[in-house]
């Protein structure tokens, strides 16, 4: 849903402005051959340095959405993950939580390299700064409901259930929520859960999910705006645009029981 929202944002802007677009997906047999004779290129997702090099051969007027590659100088639109993650964790800490776990995914580029996952990185940074060793409460697999469910079951089976969980996506959070309910853990009384993305289902979970809003559609719209501007320029200098996220408070987080007693 996250990448789909980015794509919808980009396509909506292009359609409204009567700009012709060509869609190409990595799994297509003619993936790169579709991308000839372009005025601009919007690349959504994670790409290897080799793929980025191939795209730049096609056009220097490319913009990459949700790609964090600090040593490669290309046009990028990203979220401010650092501020978002730290705001979410500070919120949990302000409620009195110190045993804060992390459930997330591992992504790979096309050449098999593990992609630098900022949410996990800033979670680790936060715990180090607090002097907390919460490594036993960490599980990483995929960004899916099924993985969230399985990772939560693993924590329950290992008797390593924290008082709060930072979930790197709403899908992961919803899977964890299901596993907790099935094993008679109350949310938020026993375990607080914080998601990430604010997808359309999070307001209707039981309880409604506290989450971090990720501006996916706006990222797509902005990419389309810039790519149309690039088309009229002879030279484009690399830039990074970082959009803010925001904490959405609902009903899945509260003080740990020790603070209430």
Map each language-model feature to its residues:
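Ligand-binding clamshell of periplasmic/extracellular solute-binding protein-like
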Residues: 45-52, 170
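Short acidic active-site motifs
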Residues: 28-31, 50-51, 147, 151
């Amino acid at each position: 849903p996250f990448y789909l929202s980015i794509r919808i944002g980009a396509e909506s802007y292009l359609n409204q402005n009567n700009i012709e677009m060509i869609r190409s997906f990595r799994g297509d047999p003619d993936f790169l051959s579709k991308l000839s004779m372009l005025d601009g290129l919007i690349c959504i997702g994670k790409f290897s340095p080799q793929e980025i090099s191939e795209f730049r051969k096609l056009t220097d007027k490319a913009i990459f959405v949700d790609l964090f590659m600090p040593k490669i100088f290309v046009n990028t639109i990203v979220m401010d993950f650092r501020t978002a993650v730290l705001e979410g964790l500070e919120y949990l800490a302000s409620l009195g939580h110190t045993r804060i776990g992390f459930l997330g995914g591992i992504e790979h580029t096309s050449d098999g390299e593990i992609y630098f996952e900022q949410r996990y990185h800033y979670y680790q940074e936060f715990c180090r700064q607090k002097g907390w060793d919460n490594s036993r409460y960490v599980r990483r697999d995929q960004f899916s409901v099924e993985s969230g469910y399985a990772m939560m079951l693993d924590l329950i089976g290992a008797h390593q259930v924290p008082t709060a969980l930072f979930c790197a996506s709403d899908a992961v959070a919803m899977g964890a929520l299901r596993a907790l309910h099935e094993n008679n853990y109350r949310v938020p009384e026993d375990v607080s859960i914080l998601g990430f993305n604010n997808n359309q289902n999070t307001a209707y979970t039981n309880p409604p999910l506290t989450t971090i809003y990720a501006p996916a559609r706006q990222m797509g719209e902005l990419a389309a705006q810039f790519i149309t501007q690039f088309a009229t320029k002879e030279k484009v200098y690399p830039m990074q645009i970082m959009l803010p996220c925001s904490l959405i408070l609902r009903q899945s987080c509260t003080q740990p029981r020790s603070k209430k007693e």
